[in-house]
Amino acid sequence: MIKKIIFGIAILLSLSCFANSTTSDGSKKDAAKTNDGTTQKIIDDFSAYAGTIKPEVRKEIQEYRVEIVDINKKKRELYNSLSKEAQNFLAEQQKYKQKLSISKLPTEDDSPNNTANSKDNKDTDTK
């Protein structure tokens, strides 16, 4: 299980390093070398940290991930059971929500609770 986690993190970090290594001044090779070293250090640090996790915690995390996969499968099945019109509406609604989240700037009177609630509402309305 830890190997899967490390492999997944390595892929994500590699992709992000690849995207960041394309610089405008043409020093792609230098940036890639630097990012590879950074990536390897992060992977090594995570491996050391993951080795300190208790087996019962690992099992709990694994069970959690299995449950999340089941929930996501049920969400897809429920979405697919909707009419095309309902699916189209939800897709359009999501586009508008994305436009709002991009254009919305944080204000001084926004509390952390309001932000958390808006994230929860967004998650429940998506596929």
From Swiss-Prot:
User: Topology with regard to the membrane?
Assistant: Lipid-anchor
Key words, A-Z: Cell membrane, Coiled coil, Lipoprotein, Membrane, Palmitate, Signal
Q: Does the keyword Iron apply?
A: no
Q: S-diacylglycerol cysteine: lipidated where?
A: 17
First and last residue of the signal peptide? 1-16
Q: Which residues form a coiled coil?
A: 56-101
What compartments host this protein?
A: Cell membrane
User: Which parts of the chain span the membrane according to its record?
Assistant: none
Annotated region (Disordered) at 101-127
One Gene Ontology cellular component term attached to this UniProt record is: plasma membrane
Specify the protein name: Uncharacterized lipoprotein RF_0128
Source organism of this protein record = Rickettsia felis (strain ATCC VR-1525 / URRWXCal2)
